[in-house]
Amino acid sequence: MEYNTSELCDTYIDVVDVVEPMFSNYGGCNSFGGSISTIKCFEDNGLIAEALQQDGEGKVLLVDGGGSLRRALLDASIAQLAVDNKWEGIIIYGSVRDVDALEDLDIGIQALASIPVGADENSVGELEIPVNFGGVTFLPLDHVYADNTGIILSPEPLDME
């Protein structure tokens, strides 16, 4: 489904939170949305790989990576897991790598930056907890919508009609 965050803000400005503009699109889909699943980790992508092996239909994985620009939490092989398991998108408050390969994948990916250095794979972090970045607190099962203009959050699904 295509989402237009500008139009959604025009209609739902009183019920959405708008994430501060700091993210760039790295995936092959320009817009995505769904119910969020959260991970909090720092320079370790083990939990991300584990989560993306689960069924992701209708879901967006939202990762609080502490804003680290030193290690990439997502690479092409982990992103391929998300595609294979039908995730709608991934938002990473941190970095990605394999940028050319990511843009060929049929999934939305937003992150702060790219860097070639990979992350540890020790599965250190927390799952399904509230996380806060970009001036917004994200709760598991909230709904997030993203496109090239921005990212917005709603406690309930938004009607696209």
Swiss-Prot record:
Which GO cellular component terms are attached?
A: cytoplasm
Gene Ontology terms describing biological process = regulation of RNA metabolic process
Per its UniProt record, what SUPFAM superfamilies does this chain match?
RraA-like (SSF89562)
Query: Do you know which InterPro entries this protein is assigned to?
Result: RraA, RraA/RraA-like, RraA/RraA-like_sf, RraA_gpbac
As for subcellular location, the record says:
Cytoplasm
Q: Does the keyword Ribonucleoprotein apply?
A: no
Q: Which GO terms describe its molecular function?
A: endoribonuclease inhibitor activity; enzyme binding
Q: Does the keyword RNA-binding apply?
A: no
**UniProt keywords, alphabetically:** Cytoplasm
What is known about what this protein does? Globally modulates RNA abundance by binding to RNase E (Rne) and regulating its endonucleolytic activity. Can modulate Rne action in a substrate-dependent manner by altering the composition of the degradosome. Modulates RNA-binding and helicase activities of the degradosome.
Family stated for the protein in its record? Belongs to the RraA family.
Describe, as the record does, how this protein assembles with itself and its partners: Homotrimer. Binds to both RNA-binding sites in the C-terminal region of Rne and to RhlB.
The name of this protein is Regulator of ribonuclease activity A
- Which organism does this sequence originate in? Shewanella sediminis (strain HAW-EB3)
